[in-house]
Amino acid sequence: MAFSTGGNRGPMADINVTPLVDVMLVLLIIFIVTAPIMTYPIAVDLPQRVLNPPPQTTEPPPPIELRIDASNQVFWNNSPTPVAQLQQKMEEVVQADPTNQPELRIDANEDAEYEVMAKVLAAAKNSQMKKIGFMQ
């Protein structure tokens, strides 16, 4: 019995890919078999076609201009208004047409107190005004 020690050949650097191909083919077969089982129908409620035309868009109402001057006086469309009555006025505007509210444009003087501005914003929030803009 003669065994060869391999002398000058060095280590074997080739990878035997046959087991790798066998494993990949088995995984492919498993995937092919299980893929049709994994699909199942999903009930989807599709929207029905409406034959009625869309509602006509109404013209937006004119904006409300709210101005706060340097002496902390509030003007509702250029008429002086106490801060305590702002929420009531805003609620009346919102209740007149909740879906088509006018834009509230606030123009505050840079010397006005923050407290007045905070009260105006709180009144707008409490009356559920949706469109609020700030002017310079």
Swiss-Prot record:
Cytoplasmic side: 1-23
Keywords of this entry: Cell inner membrane, Cell membrane, Membrane, Protein transport, Transmembrane, Transmembrane helix, Transport
InterPro entries according to UniProt: ExbD
Keyword Cell inner membrane: yes
Membrane topology field: Single-pass type II membrane protein
Keyword hit for Amino-acid biosynthesis: no
Pfam families given in the database record: ExbD (PF02472)
Subunit details: The accessory proteins ExbB and ExbD seem to form a complex with TonB.
Protein name from the UniProt record: Biopolymer transport protein exbD2
Lineage: Bacteria, Pseudomonadati, Pseudomonadota, Gammaproteobacteria, Lysobacterales
